Amino acid sequence: MNPTAEKPTNVRYGVLGFACALSMITYLDRVCFGTVMPYLQAEFQLSESEKGWLFTAFAFAYAAFEVPTGWLGDRFGARMTLIRIVLWWSFFTALTAMIYPSEGSVFPYFLLIVVRFLFGLGEAGAYPNIARAFHNWFPYNERGFAKGAVWMAGRFAGGMTAFVVYALMYETTTDGVKMEHWRHCFFIFGGLGVVWCIFWWFWYQDNPAEKAGVNAAEVALIQGGVAKHTDKLVVPWGKLLKSKNLWLLCGMYFCAAYGWYLNITFLPGYLKDQGIEKGDVKWTAQFWMAGLMAGLPLLVGSVSCLLGGYLTDWFIKRTGDVKWGRRLFGVIGHALCATCFFVAIFFMKNPWMFIFLIAFAAFWNDLTMGAAWASCLDIGKRYSGIVAGCMNTVGNLGGALAGILTGKILDWHTGDLVARSADFEAAKEQGWIFNIVLWGSAYVIAVICWFWFDASKPIEDEGHKITE
């Protein structure tokens, strides 16, 4: 039977469902740390810089192990690679809850740094290996939507994390001292990863042709004329390192991550300082408003992730222009994101308007996510896991730098300037303004990178020409 004569099955969307579920788990596990940070910071008595190093430990490990875990997926397949790394990071998620401060000792703090680093090591492989699975299961003109859906799911879960954490937290009072209990949240979130691995093991296959329920028409649709490779994978590192496209993609993602990391690191603490917190009673208007404000940038981002993925694929299907199909939405998204940051400077004394502008910035940033990750598949092809790993590696180095630099800038303003008789709150506001200028400027550079990036030029031809 001619495979094109029958209607393709839709088993590939089951892969998308698993990928979306995993994306949600990754965000629950990482965002919950930023959500509880105001309470952890008080319990461990940390400065802004010390808090920043905890965020940086995760981001640096996430960056350092993107390429190795992407290579593992390209070499051994997404099925077994994802099972191993999800179990790894789930263990360290739970272990976070078992570390307690010790008076006069810095050991618990350094142990937290190590655990956050090892947690990031595991999570580093999630999205490169999702990209690997999508390369096997989706034709290139559906990948933008698929990646957008994955990011939508993750951002949505991240946006709901504050609600979940606040609902799970409880208080006790001993000798008149109130204690917020947050540790059990990490045990619960760690368990979700184990459950996901069990179902993934039984359902997923790296080769669509070997999966029950996939017909020949769907296999033909997925392959899309791409030549199958049976040879041993040899990574063309020379071509990768010489690729202008790859360096532009990495530079763009570095700048975007530098600005975006605010949403899962310092923003919850800023809101608490401004009086936007959950209060002592659950399910009140104050509780819901605090959760909404903490998660708003990620919630609106979840919508734009899906929208951006749909738009980039729609543009390519309608025009056949892969270059502008990816570039256009990158330029628009990051340009408007930078604009929101610069405007937010004028609303520092209005926390409600400030958070809405930061949320709009997140919306425009996430409009680019489908195009960015689909571009990894466009130019990487059979090396898509490695290309995605390279992009996310450099991007999270931007996040790591943001964790260190943001905290240092805030501490310098509230320390050095106050020592010179400056008002503490005014000095802290100046520190925030300085950081906002840096975040907005980073997005301007990201726009420049998008203007030079061309997704229609693969690093190595795979027998499938991407038309413009």
Regions found by a protein language model. Give the residues of each.
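C-terminal ends and interior cores of transmembrane alpha-helices
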Residues: L87-S105, V331-K349
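Residue-level signature of mid-helix packing/kink "hotspots" within the transmembrane helices
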Residues: V31, A59-V67, A124, G159, ...
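Extracytoplasmic gate region of multi-pass secondary transporters
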Residues: F33-M37, L241-G309, W364-W373, L377, ...
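Glycine-rich segments within core transmembrane alpha-helices of 12-TM secondary carriers
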Residues: G144-Y170, G193, G301-C305, N392-G403
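Hydrophobic core of transmembrane alpha-helices in multi-pass small-molecule transporters
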Residues: F92, V106-G125, F254, C340, ...
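Extracytoplasmic
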Residues: G14-E48, N263-P268
